[in-house]
Structure formats: C-alpha cells, structure tokens
Amino acid sequence: VTPLARACGAEVVGTFLLVLFGTGSVAAAVMTGAQVGLWQVAVVWGFGVTVAIYVTAAVSGAHLNPAVTLAFAILRPKSFPRARILPYWGSQVVGAILAGAVVLAVFAPFIDRFEEERGIVRGEAGSEASAMIFGEYFPNPAIFGTGPEAEALVGPLMATAVEALGTAVLVFVIFALIEPRNGARPMWMTPFFIGFTVAILISLFAPITQAGWNPARDFGPRVVAFLAGWGDIAIPGPRGGFLAYIIGPLVGGTLGGLLYDLTIRSALPVEDPLPSEVSRGG
C-alpha cells in the first residue's frame, strides 16, 4: 500500500468522524431537542474536529477539509504536493457521504416524526427544516424558519462571503498553530485549539449560514439527502445555495492562509525555535 493510499484512507476515516459527530449533533438537536442552544452543538462539532485530527494527523496531516487541502497545496507546495489535491478531496467527500448515510440510518424514524408533526413534505419548499441536518442553508432554518421572509435576511452573495470569512479565520489559525517558526505553538494541543476555533466560529455564524467552513462536510451529506428524497432542496438547494458552501470555503481558506503568511509568518524568526512536528490541518 502506497503512502498516498494510506493518507487517503486516513482522510476518509477522519472526515467520517468529523461529519458523524457534527451532523449527528445537529440531528440530535433538531430532531430530539437533545442539545439546548447553539453553543452545545458548536462544542460537539469542535470536539469532533479535535478527535478526528488526533486520530489521523500522523498519517495524512488531517486536512479533513477540501479548503484546507487547497490552501496547503497552493501555499505549502513543498510539504503538500498539488498532485494530492484530487485524491484528498475525493477521500474527504467519501468520508462525509458515509457519515451522512449513518446519520440518516440512525435518525430516520425521528426525521419522519419531525416532518409529520410539522406538515413537511420531503423535497418540497420548506423541507429545508429537516434537510438541514445534512446540508446547510441560509439563514439557519431552525432559527429563522423557511420561506421568503427568511430568505430576504441572507442572500447567496452574503452567505458565500460569510463562509469565506469563517474559513479564512480557520485556516489562518491552523497555519499559525502548525508553523515551525512559531515559538508559541501549542504542539500536541494543536488539535484542541483547532476544534475550539471551529466551535467559536459556529457559535458566531451558524445563525446566518449554519457555519460550514468545509465543502466536504456540506456536500457529502447533501448527496445522501438528495438520494433520500429531498431532491432539489438538497442539490442545488433553494437559490442554488449549495454553491455558497463550496466556493466560499475554497476561496476563503486560501485567502486566510495567504493573509497569515503576509502578516505574521513574514515577521517570525528565521530559525525553527522548537523541534519539528507533524503538520496538522483541520
């Protein structure tokens, strides 16, 4: 088995864990009320990211996110060859699809009850309220509902910009935490701080876009929802909304990494102040 195959396998496993914990927490909150408040969901997401990174970082670098992979390929090509972009992306999407399928299998009766109680017809307008446990929608249907009044609050351009902003912050932090010349980097605590950053970003921006920051996390479960009867509500989504969760993170992640290089990395000492460690993405 080649090193690339092992790395891709780790990306499948890591992305599966991340998406399972994250979308599972959303499903539990929306369908059963198990989590009370956005911060509880955000914390589960954050710990899911942390666990997934600890499990896979030594094998693949734990990108677990196409936006992180693209940023590394463009800005750190010596450590991450660009030929690995598509294999990593494919692995991440596969892991996310598998996680979405597990969430559907586990929560299927609760989804049916949720839709029946609220008169939701799966695949029709308004079924974003149940589809949101898989893909993401703007604004957050659990907070603002669905329909024209809700849609007037957040347009596709704003949603794309918010997704770009959140992913830019995330990759900026990741680059800072793993930079060998950063004498203050937390070493083995790096995955925790990446997960904590994700939790903070979710708590801030989830009311607006559900806070994706990860094209695989959004698209993989969307595929499951599409096949499970949500159809156009899943892909392309109302107002073609799924594109916001692909374009925004891919652009924002690279811009965030570039901003780190221009503002902080360029000011760091030339010598590596600490022993090198495995690069960890998020």
What residue ranges belong to the model's regions?
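Membrane-interface helix-loop junctions and terminal tails of multi-pass membrane proteins
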Residues: 1-282
